[in-house]
């Protein structure tokens, strides 16, 4: 504990998480609601990973990226939801200093990884639709493996910088985090030391990790739309668009909820509003992604039917 708090002269050993709501009558309903969300999230994302692994016709870069996205969503929800569930059952939801920093680190890692995974998926769709004859060369095993590895490596680097400087931040007088998990801004609100460098890092990485993926996605879809419009057959246009529709939905939900959570003006963004919008970003989005891809993706639906039919005859 002391090692992790090196440089923190006012040694803090634990924090208190305020939780999502202080109303006693809401604790049990909220516990049941988020337990259900977590179970659906686990079943959906682990099910998607298993389905892709068992279905040979889904062994393509597109679905390997989807499998990686499901892994990220599963991990992201596991980092946040279990501790939130504890807050509904206890009056004082205590989290140790080291556990808080670990939660912050993994939350940032998987959040950043999701940004770049969605960008990589957009690039994959661009290659498949705009350069189909070169797809197997452009998206070879080495290429998409490098993209997936690069996503995680870069996410680890970014989160390490932010968490590392948070470890150097002093917390002397306040130890109640007005949130249901350890996030950057609620922790900085408790800091008793100068947080200028932390704020610069947050601004830099937030801009970088928003601008680069969004620019990649927008550029990819501009070329995709131009290519789709040049297709003469109506059936060809529909087929090309249908391969992108699920990804567009996932991107819209993820970035829409993220923007609503983190980009509101401070004058409009009370802590209560921040908690509510964070709930959607951290718990609902990981639950929705596998549902979107299973309900709206024809290949996934066919693979699921085959698996279920195989089970019937066993």
From Swiss-Prot:
Keywords of the record: Cell membrane, G-protein coupled receptor, Membrane, Olfaction, Receptor, Sensory transduction, Transducer, Transmembrane, Transmembrane helix
Subcellular location: Cell membrane
Entry-linked Gene3D superfamilies: Rhodopsin 7-helix transmembrane proteins
InterPro entries: GPCR_Rhodpsn, GPCR_Rhodpsn_7TM, Olfact_rcpt
Family: Belongs to the G-protein coupled receptor 1 family.
Known role: Odorant receptor.
The protein's name in its UniProt record: Olfactory receptor 8G18
Organism: Mus musculus (Mouse)
Organism taxonomic ancestry: Eukaryota, Metazoa, Chordata, Craniata, Vertebrata
Gene: Or8g18
